[in-house]
Design a protein with these regions (language model features):
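Cyclic-nucleotide recognition modules
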Residues: 67-127
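Polybasic "coupling" helices that flank or enter modular domains
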Residues: 116-146
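Glycine- and acidic-residue-biased ligand/ion/polar-headgroup-sensing regions
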Residues: 42-55, 71-72
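Short phosphate-coordinating micro-motif centered on Lys-Gly-acidic
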Residues: 33-39
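Short, small/polar residue-rich loop motifs at catalytic or cofactor-binding pockets
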Residues: 20-21, 39-41
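Local beta-strand/beta-hairpin segments that build beta-sheet-rich folds
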Residues: 34, 66-67
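Cyclic nucleotide-binding regulatory module and flanking cytosolic helices
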Residues: 1-30, 75, 79-84
């Protein structure tokens, strides 16, 4: 696994970790819905191949792509970490894609075994969420400059 989420985790620990996180992989065809608004937001998705779009309808019913998520990236982590019970967005395959899903609740709560890899995984997730936060803050800054 090359995803940043698994950085500094020993290769031999990954199969055990994925089993404990109830990981499963699913293939989606282009334009197929991966998750619908209103579905439980208790997962973290990792795009193994292809890409996905995060879609949201505005007040007038217009559908907007709020994010395009490339391969080897995460989605759903902000909702899972924030404890938001249901997705406020649709997630659709932008092209044929394969997605691995991890149980967000299990990932965020360390097990009784106090596995080293679990602590590393949580630290890696925090780093990913922080980087996305900084990117979005920069985006807000640029967008606000456009309107000056």
């Amino acid at each position: 696994m090359t995803n940043t989420l698994f950085q500094n985790i020993l290769p031999e620990d990954i199969p055990v970790m994925l089993k404990r996180l109830n990981a499963y992989t699913k293939f989606y065809q282009k334009e197929e819905y991966i998750k619908h608004a209103g579905d439980p937001a208790d997962f973290i998705g990792i795009i193994e191949s292809g890409s996905v779009h995060i879609l949201q309808d505005d007040y007038y019913g217009n559908r907007n792509i709020t994010a395009s998520i490339p391969p080897d990236s995460l989605f759903g982590e902000a909702f899972a970490c924030a404890g938001i019970p249901y997705l406020p967005v649709d997630i659709v395959a932008a092209e044929d894609c394969t997605v691995m899903f991890l149980n967000g609740k299990t990932l965020l709560n360390t097990c009784d075994n106090s596995c080293t890899f679990h602590h590393t995984l949580i630290r890696n997730l925090l780093g990913i969420v922080a980087q996305k936060n900084m990117y979005l803050n920069q985006k807000i800054k640029y967008l606000s400059l456009i309107h000056i």
